[in-house]
């Protein structure tokens, strides 16, 4: 008879997950399944159900507790020691392989499970010796079978409990130094805000539109009350998009609406649905915007990370494409089954069909959307640039602001070039507006960009003072900037003008203009 060795336990514990934070996800999904059953059985109200996480850095202890079903005493030991023998329904429940409960044992000295079932006056407890587990795995002279190994590192007992209590609790005692990250409350919260099945933040104004779409299409987003050290968690979606590093307040774009898509199999089954934000798509969204990218979820638990879809050429034509968007794809078909690591789905016919249908939107429609936005922005920008240069040119003419004739001719040539681009952009805008009239998504993008480039009167009208100054300059025969330096003679003005010309030749335009203006200001005193 074949014997399964100790290394199987290693593969299911210390070697199973690349990211230590996944232990939180594994225990949360088990608690969520239990809460669903408790609500269905009338044991707890949905509004009272809670998953409570407590992180105690000084004690090196993590506790994860739920007030759901609990486990009957007669089933407790078998359920908590049997491996990969879960009786859960994979089409209905989030955790179904019977291996997730082992996730924590490799990261602590002792992993403790406690539970009490409603109507029983006992608390069932089982302890897994994580330190001994690591010692045996590291000892090449010990070769116990997997079952003997489990028996050797587990210990169960019972305590008295109130018959009305019902809960399940996971305690990780003595979190090892190598796993300090698990005790970093801020980092844990940031991870769970992305991954866990929690509600949208109250300040995300489009959540009501998302919930309305779900109601109208017979869809449901699984959401649970999850706390970390007393603080309830929410998905940190925001409408404003920021630039720079964390803490920056520079707003570069804003979500103005959300769009929805549904994905169906060839036989009419709904495979998934998605929402994504509509903005001006000014630039790739920076990492400081926590929920950037289109995220993939099943039962509202994130599959993989923000790069799962973006890094795959199956879904995005360009690797950068995903970073222009904010949104989520919710897989709903029962055959879209998360793999053991929950970083993607198991390969099957439904997964293949899902990829084909999602690709049509991500690879084609979303690619077209942000490139379309770029074309529209460039066209409107060409008109804005021309208007700005025309105002600058007229102002310099009226105020004798050119350094010399060459400077004036260059500005005139630049203005003519800008005018040509602006004239060409009129046709581009007309064509893109036609596209917008045929596509609701592009229509929203077009109108948002058009509104942001609406000219202000102050940018296109020369002031009365400027006109008066121009008339005065004509009377005094002033054409160039240095002629305003009346305390210098013509020879000195000519020398200063030469310096200005050199600065314009060797410096970028903006810097040259700034330096010349500063020198002019100082010489005018």
Specify the residue positions occupied by each region the protein language model found.
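Bergerat-fold GHKL ATPase/HATPase_c domain
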Residues: 1-51, 59, 74-81, 497-525
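Interdomain "switch/hinge" adjacent to the Bergerat
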Residues: 1-6, 38, 42-93, 119-285, ...
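Conserved phosphate/pyrophosphate-binding and hydrolysis machinery centered on Walker-type P-loop NTPases
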Residues: 17, 21, 97, 489
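Alpha-helical scaffold elements adjacent to nucleotide-binding pockets in ATP/GTP-utilizing enzyme cores
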Residues: 24-27, 75-82, 103-107, 187-191, ...
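Glycine-rich phosphate-binding loop
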Residues: 89-108
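Short, solvent-exposed loop/turn segments at the edges of secondary structure
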Residues: 106, 163-165, 324
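Glycine-rich ATP-binding loops of the HATPase_c
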Residues: 110-114
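Charged regulatory segments coupled to nucleotide-binding catalytic modules in large multidomain enzymes
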Residues: 249-525
């Amino acid at each position: 008879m074949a014997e399964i060795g100790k290394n199987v336990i290693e593969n299911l514990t210390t070697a199973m997950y690349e990211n230590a934070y996944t232990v939180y996800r594994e225990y949360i999904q088990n608690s969520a399944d239990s809460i669903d059953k408790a609500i269905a059985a009338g044991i707890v109200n949905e509004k009272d159900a809670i998953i409570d996480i407590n992180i105690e850095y000084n004690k090196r202890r993590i506790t994860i507790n739920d007030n759901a079903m609990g486990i009957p005493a007669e089933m407790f030991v078998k359920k908590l020691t049997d491996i990969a023998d879960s009786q859960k329904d994979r089409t209905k429940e989030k955790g179904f392989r019977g291996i997730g409960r082992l996730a924590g044992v490799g990261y602590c000295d002792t992993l403790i499970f406690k539970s009490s079932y409603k109507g029983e006056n006992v608390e069932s407890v089982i302890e897994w010796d994580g330190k001994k587990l690591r010692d045996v795995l590291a000892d090449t002279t010990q070769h116990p079978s997997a079952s003997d190994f489990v028996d050797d590192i587990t210990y169960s007992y019972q305590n008295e409990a109130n018959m009305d209590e019902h809960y399940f609790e996971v305690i990780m005692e003595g979190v090892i130094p190598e796993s300090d990250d698990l005790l970093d409350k801020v980092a844990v919260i940031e991870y769970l805000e992305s991954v866990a099945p929690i509600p949208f933040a109250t300040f995300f104004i489009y959540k009501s539109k998302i919930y309305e779409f779900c109601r109208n299409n017979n869809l449901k987003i699984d959401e649970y009350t999850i706390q970390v050290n007393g603080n309830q968690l929410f998905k940190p979606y925001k409408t404003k998009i920021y630039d720079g590093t964390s803490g920056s307040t520079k707003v570069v774009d804003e979500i103005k609406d959300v769009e929805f898509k549904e994905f169906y199999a060839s036989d009419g089954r709904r495979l998934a649905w998605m929402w994504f934000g509509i903005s001006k798509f000014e630039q790739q969204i920076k990492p400081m915007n926590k929920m950037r990218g289109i995220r993939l979820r099943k039962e509202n638990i994130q599959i993989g990370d923000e790069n799962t879809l973006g890094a795959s050429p199956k879904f995005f034509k360009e690797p950068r494409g995903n970073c222009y968007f904010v949104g989520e794809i919710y897989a709903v078909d029962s055959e879209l089954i998360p793999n053991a690591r929950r970083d993607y789905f198991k390969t099957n016919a439904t997964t293949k069909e899902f990829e084909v249908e999602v690709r049509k939107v991500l690879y084609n429609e979303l690619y077209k959307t942000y490139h379309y936005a770029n074309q529209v922005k460039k066209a409107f920008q060409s008109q804005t640039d021309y208007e700005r240069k025309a105002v600058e040119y007229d102002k310099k003419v009226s105020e004798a602001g050119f350094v010399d004739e060459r400077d004036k001719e260059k500005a005139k040539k630049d203005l003519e070039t800008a005018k040509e681009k602006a004239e060409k952009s009129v046709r581009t805008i007309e064509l893109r507006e036609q596209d917008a009239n045929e596509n609701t998504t592009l229509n929203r993008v077009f109108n948002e960009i058009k509104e942001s480039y609406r000219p202000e009167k102050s940018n296109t009208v020369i002031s009365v003072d400027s006109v008066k100054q121009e008339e005065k300059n004509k009377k005094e025969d002033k054409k160039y900037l240095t002629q305003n330096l009346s305390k210098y003679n013509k020879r000195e003005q000519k020398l200063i003008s030469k310096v200005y010309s050199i600065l314009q030749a060797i410096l970028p335009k903006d810097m040259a203009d700034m330096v010349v203006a500063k020198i002019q200001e100082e010489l005018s005193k």
